Amino acid sequence: MLCWHHTFPEMNHNELVGWTEKNDSLVVLTFHTSFDYKRTLKRYEVCKPIFQKFSSGVIDITAKGESKLEQFLYLIHIGDWISCYIADLKGIDPVEVNVINHLKSEL
């Protein structure tokens, strides 16, 4: 299963140009904090309909906590649990790293 990340505003310059056809196997997860910059939020508001048009869905996850540290740790924690849950649904060992070990051995 392919997974990648990008950040605003950088994805508006590079990633977004590739969103040209519908991919029903793609789901967009967005992570937000109460500290998000207002221009970044505006960029997201403009991009969300594009994500919806070319993917099977968009899931917004907003951090809990009061400080930046609490919110960042919350998002890291929930992101890890999401990864483990999806791996379990697909019958994949979430800690197996054979391909990485192979790469390291070849280098």
Where are these regions (language model features)?
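A SIS-like phosphosugar-recognition module
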Residues: 1-107
